[in-house]
């Protein structure tokens, strides 16, 4: 199963990264890929997948459960009070899968001297805080009245960017492809 799954994944990447022009960001969501979520480990060959992405789009950033930009530990658009981009990792490969590097995304003390002790290497691994504009990540008409206010979004921006993270707002298109 794992070989078939990885072959399929790489073929999908080949299609997406060769048919649509330059791609600057690939988001690999960590939800459901490890045993913490569904009780079993999903056998992705991350090194193969990331190498294929870099081969086809050399300038692409690999984000999420990936080696270039890490998940900030919440989906509320909020950075930590103290956020460090230098992180200690346990992976020896530069093309590590983000869930397997010894960084606990929800730790309040990432990047401190204590958290770096005993790690194999240090990497530049900036944080990204997700911010759904609605109640969840996808468009549902029932959520039209749950769109977050401008004041809330501005506060999230400053409490994320102002604390050394970037913010990824989710703007979900409706069935017509329009972002309401």
Identify the residue ranges that each predicted region occupies.
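Mature catalytic domains of secreted/periplasmic carbohydrate-active enzymes
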Residues: 1-180
């Amino acid at each position: 199963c794992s070989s078939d799954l990885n072959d399929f994944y790489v073929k999908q990447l080949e299609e997406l990264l060769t048919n649509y022009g330059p791609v600057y960001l690939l988001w690999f969501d960590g939800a459901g890929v490890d045993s913490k979520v569904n009780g079993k480990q999903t056998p992705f060959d991350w090194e193969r997948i990331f190498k294929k992405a870099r081969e086809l789009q050399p300038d692409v950033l690999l984000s999420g459960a990936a080696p270039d930009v890490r998940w900030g530990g919440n989906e509320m658009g909020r950075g930590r009070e103290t956020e460090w981009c230098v992180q200690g990792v346990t992976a020896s490969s530069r093309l590590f899968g983000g869930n397997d590097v010894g960084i606990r995304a929800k730790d309040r003390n990432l990047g401190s001297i204590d958290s770096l002790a005993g790690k194999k290497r240090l990497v530049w691994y900036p944080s990204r805080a997700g911010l759904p504009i609605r109640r969840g990540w996808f468009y549902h008409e029932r959520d039209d009245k749950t769109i977050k206010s401008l004041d809330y979004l501005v506060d999230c921006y400053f409490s994320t960017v102002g604390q050394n993270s970037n913010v990824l707002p989710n703007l979900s298109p409706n069935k017509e492809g329009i972002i309401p």
